[in-house]
Amino acid sequence: MEPSLQASRRTLLRLAAAGAAGGAIAAAPLPAFAATGADRCPLPRTLSVTAPGLYPEGVAWDPRRKAFLVGSTAQGTISVVRADGSLSVLVAPFARVSVIGIQVDAVRGSIQAAYSDYFFRRLGMVDTSLPPVNGVGSFDLATGAVRQLVPVSTGESEPRTNDVTTDRHGDIYVTDTEADTITRVSREGEVLQVIRDDRFTADGTGPNGIVAHPAGYLLMGKYDGGRLFRIDHPRSARPVVREVRLDRAPASIDGLALRPDGSLVVVVNDLSLPGGAGGRDAVVVLRSTDGWRTARTLRDQTWPLADPTTVAVTPYGDYVVSGGLREILTGVPSTTPGQFQLRRR
């Protein structure tokens, strides 16, 4: 995403000030949702949330609260969004960063979040003589307290972590769309490995949404070109990367989420496509019958809300977030100022 620097700098300053005054989500194993009478918690088709300056890119479902969690690109927070549209901050700002992809690990009572000062650095809002702030954080799901902040650096001058997932062993995987990498981090916070492949490389936006499959491999989407990869043996010294052959490749792949039935929800937008607007916003559902060597399109739905970025799987449907990121990227005012939307597909 290449922001219009002057306009975007004004926008981020304004949004950060507003906040001071006041972001593919799948764990292993896949959740087995059951809407029993005691668990029933109906959600509206669309939640329009008033939150000036929040601008979420990532969303996750919190099964304990039966509520959504959203990150803030402008304020560096993680907030709880309840079924009535009310919002409260759970994780307070811990640095001048964007919180991008987030994931709930209910088994370990934690939230994982990719964070980066990429946008602030690009806009000259942080001291660029200092090293970039870029990493993956773990936070207490109950209290929001910081458990650990793990710097992730591969030597890039402007790294940008994007999405995060956790496997059944507790290892954390975070994508970097500028470094074109996937980094594996132990649950204790040690950087264990950086996974690279020539096919991850992009002139624009590279590795993006990522999910851990219960069978032990990863699925990762590359934004540019809409390519999907399966990474086998990600905990070994030599992971094996295979491209998933799609019947219809989308123009881009942003957020991903695995559903309990094994299908994969893919969010498509034109936020980072060359030239900006001109692509399409869509939500695509893919299914594989051969362990994600190939996949076919079950549904390709043009999305009615602008600039969707990712999706949260809940017991009550799959909810896609439209956080108004184009305003941060271009400085052009949102058509729904001070609001973001969560909509069921």
Show where each model-derived region lies.
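A short helix->beta-strand "capping" segment at the edge of beta-propeller domains
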Residues: 37-53
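Beta-rich, blade/repeat-based domains predominating
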Residues: 51-65, 94-119, 153-172, 199-218, ...
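Asp-box/WD-like beta-propeller blade repeats and closely related beta-sheet repeat scaffolds
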Residues: 130-167
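N-terminal secretory signal peptides
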Residues: 1-7, 16-27, 32-33
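Beta-propeller blade signature
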Residues: 132-140, 283-288, 335-345
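Short loop/turn segments that connect beta-strands within beta-propeller blades
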Residues: 82-85, 141-144, 186-190, 232-237, ...
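A short beta-strand motif characteristic of beta-propeller blades
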Residues: 44-49, 86-92, 147-153, 192-201, ...
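Conserved beta-strand positions in repeat-built beta-propeller and related beta-rich domains
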Residues: 52, 62-63, 69-74, 105, ...
